Amino acid sequence: MNTARKLFYYNGGFLRQKRVRRILSMAGYELTLGLPDRGDMVAVWGQSPNQYRGQWIAKKRKAGLLRVEDAFLRSVQPGRAGDPPLGLILDRSGCHFDASYPCDLENILHHDPLKDTDLLCRAEQAIMRIRDNHISKYNAFETTQSPPAPGYVLVIDQTFGDAALRASGAGKAEFKAMLAAARREHPDANIIIKSHAETILGHRRGYFSAADATDTIRLLATPISPWQLFDGAIAVYTISSQMGFEAILAGHTPHVFGQPFYAGWGLSKDRKPTTGRTRILSRAQLFAAAMILYPIWYDPYRDRLCALEDVLDILEAQSRAWRDDHRGWVACGMRLWKRPHLQSIFGRSKRIIFQNNLAKAHHPDRRRVFAIAGLGCDAHPAFVIGGRPVGHLLRSARAQSIGTDDRRYSHPAPRPKSPRRAVAPTGHWGGINEI
């Protein structure tokens, strides 16, 4: 018997995004075209420009409204770069970034006791994992990059015309006022303006540009871990960026010029206070509500809804794989029948260049090199790859993973091997497909 609740939609994005459809289905909703009846639900994407169509139909037909958004930990790359989300926010009351009326998250923050010991312990442990492993909403950055010299003020840019900014009534004037306040309140400090991930990739423009740079103001428009930036900052300024929430997790009390979900709970310095938020919360309570109780998390490898901790496992592995692979690979000595399989594992960021001559493997854009074991690898700084299936008794089955070693092939071992590249820790899985 089908017990899924009908969820009507009038936005082509719900039709195109397979991952979103799957998460909604597992959460108990059946995406449907047509007109809803009383008691059905209508889906809209946050406060996107075409939300009004769904809002109007829901009101006219006396149906409920479900606002769908990406969860606060989304993926390695932004959605505009092609990565699907690892979780969704399904809110029946409002939008978490619009303080003009309560949303489900604000109701949790207002009314849930948030005193369960196990819940708060989970929150503290997850915060520690997120900080230690440099996990953020988007994760396409190196963790070995040198941050600016400490002692700066961090000012966070956002994408132009973002819905969260419209909800806070913020535009170009507010960003200029925020920068002016940072300069006025910290006259002796350098200022780092952090560009948004989508701005860095060229998908959307921000409010700041190179024209705002001076001798004491630097525009940081390269990918870098936000946790590295928090470590060296003496103050953090934001309108409503999620990095303001992450700054709280890093131990800062950010100056907030908008009205995001994390403002008003005693953890930020609010320049535009929200009415009605009078409760004082701890960092763990805010995190537990926003990251454990509020979102729907999804495991694309096991095709199931999951806990936050499972998503942290996935993002840790995917981020490590991206950091290994994003510059691309040159593969030497690979037989033709192996190449499609290797491409599916190591070629997700950039397609592999196959080369038969190891001496010609060096590439001008600093691609990394791996070679089949025994291809004269002892004298070459290449990764060594052995393509044995994990279940080697099933020799006719396609390999479910690839074992790699950056020192030597696994059979003759006159010097230490490096097992850190083996299978799961790198995220290099070939036979397990994401949904």
Task: Identify the meaning behind each predicted range.
Residues 1-435:
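Catalytic-core helical/loop segments in enzymes performing group transfer/polymerization on anionic/lipid-linked
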